């Protein structure tokens, strides 16, 4: 988990690199920019993969960075072998005890979350719908699967 703190007296967010001790800051209201910079510093492979997704599908920018938040908080459990149609379990960011199953249905990824179920999740030009949970599983596979 990235530890980004808010300094009320300075009215800024701060992130300290655990390896180098370097301190990154961002003004109040810009926590998302500091988060992106911290990810780029600590996990360049994840940062680059997120940028590639966004470059190819700009409509996925918001859910991509939410997916990165999930990954950096160790919220993705991808199964080595699918359990039925379930490929992964991904934490809910709104319910601390909730997890969503990411599965395959008719060759496409599906999620149990409200965003995906209500057809509100963004659609790519290829016609695929992506919520943050599906993208978290995808980015985890792209950046983590070969590391173990």
Positions of the model-derived regions?
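Long, low-complexity, compositionally biased intrinsically disordered regions
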Residues: 1-148
